[in-house]
């Protein structure tokens, strides 16, 4: 039974992710958000809450990220209304937008890795 529930939760999460990405591209025109990417959705087991993980292109400072998240969280009711029209769910989850730092962390790890390769290459010469 758990497998079927998890499969349903996974499918709904992916569909919410896809729909919100489209909504952000087509319906939310705020320069403080700019170009955003929905990198994941964490849906609660009862489908009443969803954490939406986003990243912003060319928004790197904490203030820019904070401002973008503020705008998205303020627009969450509007986004839920659109989801309600486009998805056939009994409950449209309450949306909370969270910045996804994994891309930045991945870049930092990649930089460390590349720096170590350069150091090793210089030592072997």
Curated annotation (Swiss-Prot):
Record InterPro entries: KH_dom-like_a/b (IPR015946), RbfA (IPR000238), RbfA_dom_sf (IPR023799), Ribosome-bd_factorA_CS (IPR020053)
Compartments where located: Cytoplasm
Main location group: cytoplasm
Recorded GO MF terms: ribosomal small subunit binding
A Pfam match: RBFA
One of the record's GO cellular component terms: cytosol
GO biological process, one term: maturation of SSU-rRNA
Function: One of several proteins that assist in the late maturation steps of the functional core of the 30S ribosomal subunit. Associates with free 30S ribosomal subunits (but not with 30S subunits that are part of 70S ribosomes or polysomes). Required for efficient processing of 16S rRNA. May interact with the 5'-terminal helix region of 16S rRNA.
Subunit structure: Monomer. Binds 30S ribosomal subunits, but not 50S ribosomal subunits or 70S ribosomes.
Protein name: Ribosome-binding factor A
Biological source species: Wigglesworthia glossinidia brevipalpis
């Amino acid at each position: 039974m758990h497998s079927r529930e998890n499969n349903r939760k996974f499918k709904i999460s992916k569909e919410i992710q896809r729909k919100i990405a489209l909504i952000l591209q087509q319906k939310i025109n705020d320069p403080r958000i700019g170009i955003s990417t929905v990198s994941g959705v964490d849906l609660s087991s009862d489908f009443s809450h969803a954490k939406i993980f986003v990243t912003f292109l060319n928004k790197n400072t904490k203030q820019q990220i904070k401002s973008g998240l503020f705008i998205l969280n303020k627009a969450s009711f509007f986004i839920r209304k659109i989801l309600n029209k486009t998805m056939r769910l009994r409950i449209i989850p309450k949306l909370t937008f969270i910045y996804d730092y994994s891309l930045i962390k991945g870049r930092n790890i990649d930089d460390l890795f590349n720096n170590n390769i350069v150091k090793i290459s210089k030592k072997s010469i």
